[in-house]
């Protein structure tokens, strides 16, 4: 099911579909491992992304030009790289990545996220979640992290004592007291 005709048109442009009819054959997308959504495509709903079960790389710019307010990647368990670029007033308020345990690179900066659970993402190497509304961020299970960018949120504390591999940390512009 692909309810957004703009998303389906993008899939047609990529050769995964051939007519706008609200769906795409699973056989056409079951082996797709990379999907890069264009910035100015106008996609507002990515329902159907869950059927791209082989995806290891997904890039979605979200904002005025792609006004996506929710995204379900819980079925995309092969993802190792997920880039949700917040541009032009993104309204994305939540994202569940607890099922994406293979994730190594996750960028979700410049959205309206109020919480982010990365406790199941123990393979994370790079986490960029700056410019959100996060009040809490627990990275104690993410011991492989080499880069953590979480500035510009509402964090009052941040414990990186378990993150001994960190080579880059930017937590400026929060309300950190510990």
Briefly describe each language-model feature range.
Residues 160, 167-178:
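Low-complexity/repetitive intrinsically disordered segments
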Residues 66, 87-90, 111, 132, ...:
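Consensus "Asn ladder" position of solenoid repeat domains
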Residues 1-64, 68-77, 81, 99-101, ...:
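N-terminal capping/linker segments that flank leucine-rich repeat
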Residues 83, 105-107, 126-128, 147-149, ...:
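Consensus positions within tandem repeat domains that build extended binding/scaffold surfaces
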Residues 109-110, 115, 119, 140, ...:
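Serine residues within intrinsically disordered or low-complexity segments
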Residues 68, 87, 95-97, 125:
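Short hydrophobic transmembrane-like helices used for membrane targeting/insertion
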């Amino acid at each position: 099911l692909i309810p957004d005709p703009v998303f389906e048109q993008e899939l047609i442009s990529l050769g995964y579909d051939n007519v706008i009819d609200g769906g795409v054959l699973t056989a056409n997308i079951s082996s797709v491992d990379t999907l890069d959504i264009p910035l100015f495509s106008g996609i507002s709903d990515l329902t159907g992304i869950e059927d791209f079960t082989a995806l290891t790389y997904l890039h979605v710019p979200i904002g005025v030009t792609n006004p996506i307010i929710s995204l379900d990647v819980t079925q995309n368990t092969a993802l190792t790289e997920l880039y949700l670029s917040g541009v032009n007033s993104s309204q994305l308020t939540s994202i569940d990545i607890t099922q994406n345990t293979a994730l190594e690179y996750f960028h979700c900066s410049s959205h309206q996220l109020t919480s982010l659970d990365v406790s199941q993402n123990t393979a994370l190497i790079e986490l960029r979640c700056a410019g959100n509304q996060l009040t809490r961020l627990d990275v104690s299970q993410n011991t492989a992290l080499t880069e953590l960018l979480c500035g510009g949120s509402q964090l009052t504390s941040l414990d990186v004592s378990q993150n001994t591999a960190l080579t880059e940390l930017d937590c400026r512009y929060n309300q950190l007291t510990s």
